[in-house]
């Protein structure tokens, strides 16, 4: 079973998509299997992250800003602004896909894990995520 979910972002931020993924798994009626998520973009990514304390996500963003600075004169690719190349680098350093086991019709996430779309651009975008469910 496969579907594309569209997520609207508000610019650079992390969007918790756990509920959308769980809903799709529930509708699939798959009790045991795998859920694969793949984002069709090169300036946003998918991560598993702490979901209870928003400071964790803020700290990750602050760390990434220190590692990959917007508008760095080192970058030649600036076609869409000072956040363009940094967004591509951030995407490469994180992940474009996740695979999560399914048991009893639910994602087998840890107690504090959530599934996040990490938008790396300044402006709002609509992002496509391909969700594929494989039955065991």
Language-model region placement:
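Active-site histidine-anchored catalytic micro-motif
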Residues: 1-136
């Amino acid at each position: 079973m496969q579907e594309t979910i569209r997520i609207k972002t508000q610019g650079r931020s992390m969007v918790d998509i756990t509920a959308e993924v769980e809903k799709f798994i529930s509708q699939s009626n798959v009790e045991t299997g795998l859920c694969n998520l793949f984002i069709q973009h090169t300036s946003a990514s998918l991560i598993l992250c702490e979901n209870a304390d928003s400071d964790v996500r803020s700290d990750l963003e602050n760390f990434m800003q220190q590692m990959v600075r917007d508008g760095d004169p080192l970058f030649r690719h600036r076609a869409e602004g000072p956040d363009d190349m940094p967004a591509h680098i951030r995407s490469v350093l994180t992940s474009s896909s996740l695979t999560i086991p399914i048991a009893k019709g639910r994602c087998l996430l840890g107690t504090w894990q959530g599934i996040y779309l990490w938008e790396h651009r300044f402006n709002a975008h609509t992002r496509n995520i391909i969700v594929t469910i494989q039955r065991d």
